[in-house]
């Protein structure tokens, strides 16, 4: 599974392309999925998926918590299995340091993976840390977090940059904030202390307070078919008002 995280402070020297890929996480499982389903609960802001394999039913859910500034991802399975968590810094070497290019390295630090680098043309530094909580065995091998024989694993990601919103950021196009390393470390410690369920509870309370302000009904009846089934029927020329609404 590939997860992309974006930021709007990695603009290039031409002040274009402000939204950029900050970091990618690859989560690799040692199974083959069947009966795969996925969705997003727009009332709680939680993405979820499930599938069946030789390890039984696997359930995954993820959210980004605004109150705690942390991304949380949980996977649960009926039978113990393995997984790997690998971080990738995109666009390294694509541009030069003066043309919006970035530097970066990934290394193990205190039982976590740390991602650190700079955007020289913007005088910007960035930092991220990835931690895993699991009931299985956990090791760090070649810059990857490896989990074995686990029924449950929680992945936490915290990241930040030295960008500071101030007049100089617009007049000079260069960051004037502080190095984010300590800030990232303290956020991760706080998230680990809260634990997954508390992080989820705080996220839902925050997100739902906004989403529950309005409700609307677009009508129609849901007959239980999946999106791919509806699309196939639609391509065959059948009327599918559920797609058009």
Q: Residue ranges of each PLM-predicted region?
A:
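Aromatic-residue-lined binding/catalytic grooves and analogous aromatic/hydrophobic interfacial grooves
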Residues: 1-245
């Amino acid at each position: 599974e590939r997860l992309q995280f974006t930021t709007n402070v990695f603009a290039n020297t031409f002040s274009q392309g402000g939204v950029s890929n900050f970091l990618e996480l690859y989560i690799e499982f040692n199974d083959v999925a069947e009966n795969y389903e996925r969705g997003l609960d727009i009332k709680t802001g939680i993405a979820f998926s499930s599938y069946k394999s030789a390890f039984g039913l696997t359930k995954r859910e993820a959210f980004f918590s605004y109150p705690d500034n942390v991304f949380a991802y949980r996977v649960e399975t009926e039978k113990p299995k393995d997984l790997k968590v690998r971080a990738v810094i995109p666009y390294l070497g694509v541009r030069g340091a003066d043309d919006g290019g970035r530097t970066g390295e990934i290394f193990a630090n205190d039982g976590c993976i740390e991602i650190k680098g700079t955007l020289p043309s913007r005088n910007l530094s960035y930092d991220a840390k990835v931690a895993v909580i699991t009931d299985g065995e956990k090791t760090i091998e070649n810059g990857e977090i490896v989990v074995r024989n686990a029924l449950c694993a929680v992945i936490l990601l915290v990241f930040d940059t030295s960008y500071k919103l101030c007049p100089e950021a617009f007049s000079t196009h260069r960051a004037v904030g502080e190095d984010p390393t300590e800030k990232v470390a303290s956020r991760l410690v706080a998230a680990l202390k809260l634990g997954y369920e508390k992080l989820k509870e705080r996220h839902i309370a925050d997100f739902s307070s906004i989403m529950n302000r309005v409700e609307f009904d677009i009508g129609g009846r849901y007959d239980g078919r999946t999106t791919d089934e509806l699309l196939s029927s639609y391509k065959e020329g059948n009327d599918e008002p559920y797609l058009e609404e």
